[in-house]
């Protein structure tokens, strides 16, 4: 297994630098992350096996798995490796929004590695066809974890640090993967920080109404009047639709197409509901650009927009604009282009990455969440296991394995695991689907008061709530202890004592 040939973006890079990087098996694409503490990431490709578990179908065929690496803070031979298990998107997006890892690497003299998940970003086993039906058979959690394990071993060997203690990091689905890495490959990973990892929910456990109930709670907590206004807006849309006033809905909400069928109404409801999901997840106390440009405290801003409009449907339109029209240049909402219904009711996004995630939600990742207009403020949009099965058969020709993650990765019964931190923010609607209490002395749960989706992974900010500052201190301490313990467990090099002394016979 060798690193993929590199193609430098900046052809003016001195040749001696490229030679040095190539000698390490690392080829520089001169890409950088924009952070307060700049890690100076270099983009690389690794020749990764297409199929780790079948010796016949693809043999030794490989694809280019992208990863980012920074040795800016690394004390070679002594510092640990901090390894981000990439999730459902371009790896640069996660690297640019995980500043805590950079800060921690500077403190603990660690090598930083961000590994892209197969089928996402530029890590495409079948090129541009990868996310088309008929080419997705190698997209599984298990294959992705094996990618990470093989890449990590190759890096260690190439850099001559076979025993460097490694800590896995990840957020959301990536947080699930970091925990799974510790569980499946404990000989490679000494511990894991699993931020906002919904390991219980995605295993098909828990309450199907939990997610949208918790999104509602975020807005109700900001303003009970806001939550009621949301209910009123959706009800007005429904009433107008039943009256056949399709043009009125389109004019007030600003859709590009006039609604004409129940399918259009459901699409509009899903489109609007998704805006609330994004605002709740991204409810950070400062402006961000993770899932798109958002202001500080976007839930508060969204409620202000909604309540400032005298007409409720127009208020709903103004709130949705935070997500779908941040530039203010969209003349209307193309609800079928901007939002695509999929096997994840919380939203898949659009484009190739969205198709890959849709497939995963049709196979191993169980996301059967409903809104019911009783425990939440949204229209009734059911998504049962039966509906999931039919959608997945029609779309991908696959039958979901409803309980597979309970079998393969233990569901919520993780007492036998060790050295995992499950962190959640109390503002994050995913928190209710994760581990929320300590399972043992080394599998611990921490809650960030005033924290949204994996806030602790983000770089330190003067607007951070005090709780996340304390949580990061705890995480830093535990990670340092895990690294130290892993070093103590490393076997000493055996020494040959020499020939036994022969005693003369008596």
Curated annotation (Swiss-Prot):
Q: What class of enzyme is it?
A: hydrolase
Kindly give the Pfam families that the UniProt entry links to this protein. Peptidase_S28 (PF05577)
- Signal peptide residues on this chain, from the entry's feature table: 1-33
- Gene encoding the protein: Dpp7
| Xref: InterPro entries | AB_hydrolase_fold (IPR029058), Peptidase_S28 (IPR008758), Ser_carbopepase_S28_SKS (IPR042269)
Record-listed E.C. numbers: 3.4.14.2
In which broad location class does this protein mainly occur, judging by the first location in its UniProt entry?
Answer: other
Gene3D superfamilies membership: alpha/beta hydrolase (3.40.50.1820), Serine carboxypeptidase S28, SKS domain (1.20.120.980)
The source's superkingdom equals Eukaryota
The record's similarity note reads: Belongs to the peptidase S28 family.
Source species of the chain? Mus musculus (Mouse)
The protein's name is Dipeptidyl peptidase 2
- Tell whether Transcription regulation is among the UniProt keywords: no
Listed under subunit, the entry gives: Homodimer.
**Biological process, per Gene Ontology:** lysosomal protein catabolic process; proteolysis
Claim: Transport is one of the keywords in the record:
no
């Amino acid at each position: 297994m060798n690193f993929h040939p590199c193609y430098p973006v900046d052809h003016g890079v001195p040749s001696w630098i490229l030679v040095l990087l190539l000698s390490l098996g690392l080829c520089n694409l001169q890409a950088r992350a924009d952070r307060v503490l700049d890690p100076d990431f270099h983009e690389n490709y690794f020749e990764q096996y297409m199929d780790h578990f079948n010796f016949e179908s693809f043999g030794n065929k490989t694809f280019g798995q992208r990863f980012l690496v920074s040795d800016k803070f690394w004390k070679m031979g002594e510092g640990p490796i901090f390894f981000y298990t990439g999730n459902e998107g371009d790896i640069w997006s996660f690297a640019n929004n995980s500043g805590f890892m950079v800060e921690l690497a500077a403190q603990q003299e660690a090598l930083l590695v961000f590994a892209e998940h197969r089928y996402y970003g530029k890590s495409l086993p079948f090129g541009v066809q990868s996310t088309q039906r008929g080419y997705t058979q190698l997209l599984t959690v298990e294959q992705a974890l094996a990618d990470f394990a093989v890449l990590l071993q190759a890096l260690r060997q190439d850099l001559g640090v076979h025993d460097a203690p490694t800590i896995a990091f990840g957020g959301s689905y990536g947080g699930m993967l970091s925990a799974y890495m510790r569980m499946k490959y404990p000989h490679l990973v000494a511990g894991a920080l699993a931020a906002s990892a919904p390991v219980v929910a995605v295993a098909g456990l828990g309450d199907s109404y939990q997610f949208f109930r918790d999104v509602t709670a975020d807005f109700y907590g900001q303003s009970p009047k806001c939550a009621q206004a949301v209910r009123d807006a959706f009800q007005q849309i429904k009433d107008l639709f039943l009256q056949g006033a399709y043009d009125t809905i389109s004019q007030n909400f600003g859709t590009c197409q006039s609604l004409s069928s129940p399918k259009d109404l459901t699409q509009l409801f899903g489109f609007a509901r998704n805006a609330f999901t994004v605002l709740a997840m991204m409810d950070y106390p400062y402006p961000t650009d993770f899932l798109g440009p958002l202001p500080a405290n976007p839930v508060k801003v969204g409620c202000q927009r909604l309540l400032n409009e005298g007409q409720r449907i127009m208020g709903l339109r103004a709130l949705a604009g935070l997500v779908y029209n941040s530039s203010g240049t969209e003349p209307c909402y193309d609800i079928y282009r901007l939002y695509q219904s999929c096997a994840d009711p919380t939203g898949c996004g659009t484009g190739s990455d969205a198709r890959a995630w849709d497939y995963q939600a049709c196979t191993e990742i169980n996301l059967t969440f409903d809104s019911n207009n009783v425990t939440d403020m949204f229209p009734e949009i059911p998504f049962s296991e039966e509906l999931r099965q039919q959608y997945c058969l029609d779309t991908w020709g696959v039958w979901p394995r409803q309980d597979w993650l309970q079998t393969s990765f233990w569901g919520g019964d993780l007492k036998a695991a060790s050295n995992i931190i499950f962190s959640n923010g109390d503002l994050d609607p995913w928190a209710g689907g994760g581990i929320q209490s300590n399972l043992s002395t080394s599998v611990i749960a921490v809650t960030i008061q005033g924290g949204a989706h994996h806030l602790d992974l983000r770089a330190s900010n003067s607007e951070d709530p005090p709780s996340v500052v304390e949580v990061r201190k705890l995480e830093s301490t535990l990670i340092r202890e895990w690294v130290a313990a892993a070093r103590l467990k490393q076997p000493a090099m055996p020494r040959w004592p020499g020939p036994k002394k022969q005693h003369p016979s008596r």
